[in-house]
Amino acid sequence: MSDSPCLSPPAPSQGPTTPRKGPPKFKQRQTRQFKSKPPKKGVKGFGDDIPGMEGLGTDITVICPWEAFSHLELHELAQFGII
């Protein structure tokens, strides 16, 4: 045979050489930050007005959060983590 230039075998077709990346990973915030200030309590302390609570004094604070925040809607209470 003669010394003719050899044809090299065709290069195998390869896909992209960059490795495939998964979805981005998100870090969860440790503290909850609110854009607005939490609501203030509307009613503080009932004293002896509550039936069955006589004798506890007049310096007691609200027992039930829905009584303290009765002027707000449920979604507003949930927004600030009150309920």
Curated annotation (Swiss-Prot):
GO biological process, one term: positive regulation of MAPK cascade
Keyword field: cGMP, Hydrolase, Sensory transduction, Vision
Keyword Hydrolase: yes
A Pfam family: PDE6_gamma
GO MF annotation list: 3',5'-cyclic-GMP phosphodiesterase activity; cGMP binding
Chemical reaction(s) catalysed: 3',5'-cyclic GMP + H2O = GMP + H(+)
Location of the region described as Disordered in the Swiss-Prot/TrEMBL record: 1-51
This protein's GO CC annotations: photoreceptor outer segment membrane
EC number: 3.1.4.35
Biased composition (Basic residues): 22-43
Top-rank EC class of the record's enzyme: hydrolase
Keyword Hydrolase in annotation: yes
Quaternary assembly: Tetramer composed of two catalytic chains (alpha and beta), and two inhibitory chains (gamma).
Its biological purpose: Participates in processes of transmission and amplification of the visual signal. cGMP-PDEs are the effector molecules in G-protein-mediated phototransduction in vertebrate rods and cones.
Domain characteristics, as noted in the entry: The C-terminal region is important in conferring inhibition.
Family: Belongs to the rod/cone cGMP-PDE gamma subunit family.
Name the record gives this protein: Retinal cone rhodopsin-sensitive cGMP 3',5'-cyclic phosphodiesterase subunit gamma
Organism: Rattus norvegicus
Gene name for this UniProt entry: Pde6h
